[in-house]
Amino acid sequence: MQSTSSTSSGSCSRPLEGSTLNSGGSAENVARDGGSGDDSVGIGDENPSGSSAATNGHDSKHNGFIVNNNGSSSRIVDGENNRENTSCSGVQLDKSNQEIIRLIGQYLHDVGLDKSVQTLMLESGCYLEHPSATKFREHVLMGDWSKADSDLKDLEPLIDNGKLATITEMKFILLEQKYLEHLDDGNPLDALHVLRSELTPLQHNITRVHQLSSYMMCSTNQDLYQRAKWEGKGILSRALVMERLQTFMPPSVMMSPRRLRTLLQQAVELQSQHCPCHDMAWETNLETVSLLTDHCCTTDGFPMQTIQILTDHCDEVWFCKFSPDGLKLATGSKDSTVIIWDVDPYKLTLKHRRVLDGQAQLSVSFVSWSPDSKLILVGGTEDSHELYIWNVDDGKLVVKFSQSLEDSLACGAFSRDGARFVCGGQKGQLYLCDLNGTIVDSWEGVRVNSIAFRADNKTILAADNHYRIRGYNFDSPRSDFDILREPHPIMTFSINSADRLALLNVSNQGLHLWDIEDKCLVRRFQGIRQSNFAIHSCFGGVNESFVASGSEDKVVYIWHIKREEPLAKLAGHTKTVNCVSWNPVYPSLLASASDDATVRIWGPKPNGSSATTESDDCSSSSSSSSWNMT
């Protein structure tokens, strides 16, 4: 950015006149100033007093430079070495303080406070960048390519120790802009000269040279802008070129654009990573946070204590699942019943709707909801050969599926489009069926513990007795393939809504998180106790930022998806917690099913109460939670 400004010359009392602006800023800032600014501040300009070249030279040994102050103490501008600088006010500035002042100066200029920058630089005795870098910036923004090339020669010893490849790439960037501007001006012969006599001899990025040559055929300037993806001749495109060139320069010579904002953004992101309750749907940037306090998401609205206990089952409750619309909960029990509960999202309470008890002598081990929340698929243990599909609105049995008395149908799931379901078990059957219960296809010899459809509605994932999760595609051509393998039996698993992560409950190992696209183990969550019984975990919270699982130690565990240590331990059940389900629409609700024949509904604590107090709805039973906020 070209601008007239002032800097110090042996005195703190007045600025120099006729010097050049060094912004160290961004393309946006250059565009804002329009490439000029008579009232701007001069920072890092050449010594205007006519002193020798050595005065404005650089000490290559230290990769910095010393500016003559006409008799005053020298100001050492050295961002790479631990050397002190004496400011005009007599304050000794070490390397760290010099860098902070330079960062502040760059930021102040970016927001347009140029007079403040002038005062800061005069009083501190610091410069934002090397004087040769200032000239280089000025000439690039002016489009004076011959002078910019000369400036680059002066800067060579400071850039990557004068490495030829780096200097060549920088020259290429300059000549590329020069070539495009000639085309924009309607000077194809000048552009051709640059292409043949300046760009081609560099022998750099030949593919790009060929691409540039094709722009000679552009019939209009707009065609050139579109094909080259270029802003056109002017201050904005030159500022973007300057940003590219800055990346090659050490920070002691020229800081990268928006450096302070970059550091602050990194700090905010690091704080969000350390936030135990961080909501990953919340965009972490400088516009959404306060820099005056450390970031920490609150636990308001988080399911942290029992708000209701459902006691309608008369035996162990093995499964619970909220519907996709968040307005219903299905619970399945060893007592052969499935109970449908209505969710009041405003009062955060559940009300008994109906009992589905047509599956006589079937201990209900799993329930799967259709995507429209109207149907449920119900199955039993590995000894069961039947599955049931119920309409939850009218309570009618839609399908009773059974292929053979020898079958084991202990797991099943609807497809993501709700048009089909898949089921299987430990005796080697894997059936793909339509909603009438007609077998569309089957796969023999597949012994599975848990099953799920992927989002493509074609691929079925199944955990088998070889400690694997494999993919099965029934479409032509049929295919099966390994997704992942564990060293111990996979008891159950679930897939997140983004269809990228799998949450596995592994025998004697606990809870593991896998990336099923990259096929790698992401995290081992600590805390739960699990032997050889089926425990069902889930993703949940806003944007599925958390995971939860039951445990044989009677506790519900909650983790942030990026932390191995449990975030919360929800106590209240008196026996093993078999299953947990997080409401997908109302993330303040979490359900847990237990061998103690109850289903607990966990919700936010009332305002003013502690995490260990009980709500009025469950005063007859103990309920508490412990929170790990470290």
From Swiss-Prot:
GO terms for cellular component: cytoplasm; GID complex; mitochondrion. GO terms for biological process: proteasome-mediated ubiquitin-dependent protein catabolic process. WD repeats lie at residues 312-351, 359-400, 404-443, 445-482, 485-524, 529-569, 572-612. Residues 48-57, 66-75 have a biased composition (Polar residues). Residues 129-190 form the CTLH domain. Its main location: cytoplasm. Residues 96-128 form the LisH domain. This is WD repeat-containing protein 26 homolog. Residues 1-13, 609-630 have a biased composition (Low complexity). The modification Phosphoserine is found at S36, S40.
